[in-house]
Swiss-Prot record:
Domain of life of the source: Eukaryota
Main subcellular location of this protein, as a coarse class: secreted
Protein name as catalogued: Phospholipase A2 inhibitor gamma subunit B1
Sugar attachment sites: 14
Subcellular location: Secreted
Protein species of origin: Crotalus durissus terrificus
Amino acid sequence: IECEVCMKPGDRCNGSMMT
């Protein structure tokens, strides 16, 4: 599953947290 919105820290992107 690809992440749609991961701009804010803590958002889950591909199972990883976007910092």
